[in-house]
Swiss-Prot record:
Species of origin: Drosophila melanogaster
UniProt gene name: Rga
Cell location: Cytoplasm
Swiss-Prot/TrEMBL keywords: Cytoplasm, RNA-mediated gene silencing, Transcription, Transcription regulation, Translation regulation
Protein name: Regulator of gene activity
KW Hydrolase (keyword) present: no
Biased composition (Gly residues): 349-367
Residue ranges, annotated region (Disordered): 42-93, 148-191, 349-394
Length: 585
């Protein structure tokens, strides 16, 4: 128990009901006002001051042993003076509670009508003056009163907070069935201190703890996917058609099962005798004919007993559809309703999303709902597919379909992922080091040169599956005359140089550029030339410093820049005749 700071010198008790209970040394000592079971009110020599109570409640040997024991905690002293037998020891002179100013004390109301008058009823009489009859007086006469009668004093707040003493209030009450009764005088099932301290205004009434936060569909009704208490899921969507209107949707899972989804928003205009089906399942019909069950499913469709598509002349639906693998949001009311998507706009959403799609008009009656998600599979399987048995499918028409291209590399990598024996043989290829544009929206297999090349294929190196009738280069290359490079412009010469690496044409283009005063810098890897009309260059020995033209192959432009040219870093003109004779160039 915390320090209550209720100590004051003894004063005369004006209440005759309490004064009549005093015996022995307590007879002339009437205590009025706030009287607490603190030891500061007693003198140091309790037995000498009150001789009639020297052996009160225990033998002298027990009293002497009690004086030799160390000071008990406040909770222990309170238990000995309230719930246990009456113990009067010399250690009561210890001041457990600090001095409190008189102005802070509350005025005491009548003791006769307050809980103090009934103190003996719950203290269980018969233990040395604790009850109303007999016992020769005891600590009850010196019991300080904490509050007014019956807890009617509501102007002053409670002295203790139950959160600081959970064992005194609700926490103690929760364990009453499991914990044994610490005081044999307490009735079975009673709370030892809860009612006592509460009635005296010492603690606040325990408040019920709030439960943990839970979100229901009423809190966020506009959010799709809110879980209901019955296990269904809310979906926001609408099904509208000229021939009728109805709302339904189902949520497809990866295992092929479907879960009903509550349709919240259903809108549409009905013409003729078409009714409206709103519920877990339903759909629009052909007038009064095509109304059926099945709900709005992935890929669309509609008709009696099917997936609930649009009516005659009507467009299909917009809604939330959670599809298998990848959700296809948007459907159509195609003829027969067999997941055909003519003139429909579709959105991709993993696990379903919010979107809309419009389809062509047609009759949805007699349609058939397909749960194989064939339209989804086409969208999901957009790349090369490999099966466990080694079969490779879905190869693009422009891709080389042998083991030397990207298909062979992809097949080997995927096989190494499943076969532990091939892990050590798999290629540690860095995709970023192959010169591929990984951010490209187009397919990369057209310029993929292989895992052993650090740059993509050139335009003339791209291999295409062309008919053999067009492969005539090997037959006519020796019959063609040599190109006249002197008639070509400089940009075409640069194209021949950069696109025919390691070929005879590259040497011929380099020789022609050299004859046109272009020089190839072996360190800068660029072609440079002097700017016409500028003859002022700073010469330092054999080096020249000035502004030169250079050809930028990335931007394919001729730009100017200041260079310090060392003639030893410039490549010489290749000797074409020596190369033709098999000599070094």
């Amino acid at each position: 128990m915390a320090n209550l700071n209720f100590q004051q010198p003894p004063r005369s008790i004006a209440n005759a009901a309490l004064a009549g209970r005093t015996t022995g040394g307590f007879g002339g000592s009437s205590l009025a006002g706030h009287v607490t079971p603190t030891s500061g009110m007693f003198q140091t020599d309790f037995a000498n001051s009150y001789p009639g109570t020297a052996n009160y409640g225990q033998a002298p040997q027990q009293q002497q042993q009690q004086q030799q024991q160390p000071q008990l905690s406040p909770n222990r002293n309170a238990q000995l003076s309230v719930g246990g037998p009456a113990i009067s020891s010399g250690n009561r002179n210890a001041n457990l509670f600090g001095q409190r100013q008189f102005v802070e004390r509350r005025a005491m109301q009548g003791l006769g009508s307050g809980p103090m008058s009934n103190m003996g009823n719950f203290m269980q009489t018969g233990r040395g003056g604790y009850g109303t009859g007999g016992g020769g007086g005891g600590p009850l006469n010196n019991f300080h009163v904490f509050g007014g009668g019956g807890g009617s004093d509501t102007s002053t707040p409670a002295l203790l907070d139950p959160t600081e003493f959970p064992s005194l209030t609700n926490a103690r009450g929760q364990n009453d069935q499991t914990l044994p009764q610490s005081n044999p005088l307490q009735p079975p099932g009673s709370k030892p201190y809860g009612n006592f301290f509460t009635s005296f205004g010492m603690v606040k009434q325990p408040t019920s703890e709030q439960s943990e936060f839970t979100m229901s569909n009423e809190d966020f009704p506009a959010l799709p996917g809110t879980q209901n208490s019955d296990g269904t899921t809310n979906a926001v969507g609408s099904v509208a058609g000229t021939g009728g209107s109805g709302g339904a949707s189902t949520e497809n899972h990866l295992d092929g099962t479907e879960k009903p989804m509550n349709s919240i928003v259903v809108s549409g205009s009905a013409s003729g005798s078409s009714g409206s089906n709103v519920g877990v399942v339903g759909g629009n019909g052909l007038g009064a004919v095509g109304s059926g069950i099945g709900g709005l499913a992935v890929g669309g469709g509609g008709g009696a007993g099917s997936s609930g598509g649009g009516g005659v002349g009507g467009n299909a639906a917009s809604g939330v559809v959670g599809g298998s693998h990848v959700g296809l949001v948007g459907s159509n009311s195609g003829i027969g309703g067999v997941n055909s998507v003519p003139n429909s706009n579709a959105m991709m959403g993993v696990g379903g999303g919010l979107g809309s799609g419009s389809g062509s008009s047609g009759s949805g009656a007699g349609g058939e709902h397909l749960n194989d998600n064939s339209s989804n599979d086409k969208l999901v399987k957009s790349g090369v597919q490999t099966s466990p048995d080694g079969k490779v499918t879905n190869i693009p028409a422009t891709m080389v379909n042998n083991q030397f291209g990207m298909v062979g590399l992809l097949t080997f990598i995927r096989a190494a992922e499943t076969d532990p024996n091939l892990v050590t043989l798999s290629l540690g290829t860095d995709l970023t080091g192959l010169g591929l544009n990984l951010n490209s929206q187009e397919s990369l297999h057209t310029t993929f040169a292989g895992p052993f090349v650090a740059q993509p294929c050139r335009a003339q190196d791209v291999e295409f599956n062309v008919p053999p009738e067009y492969l005539i280069n090997f037959a006519i290359r020796d019959k063609l005359t040599a190109p006249v490079l002197k008639k070509l412009q400089e940009d075409l010469l640069f194209f021949l140089f950069y696109t025919n690496i390691g070929d005879m044409m590259q040497l011929m283009a380099a020789a022609e550029l050299h004859s046109r005063e272009w020089r190839y810098h072996v360190e800068e890897k660029i072609w440079i030339t002097r700017i016409p009309g500028i003859d002022q260059y700073e010469k330092n020995g054999t080096k020249e410093r000035g502004t030169f033209y250079y050809f930028d192959a990335q931007s394919w432009k001729r730009l100017s820049k200041v260079f310090q040219i060392d003639p030893e870093k410039l490549d010489k003109c290749p000797n074409i005749s020596a190369f033709m004779n098999g000599q070094s160039v």
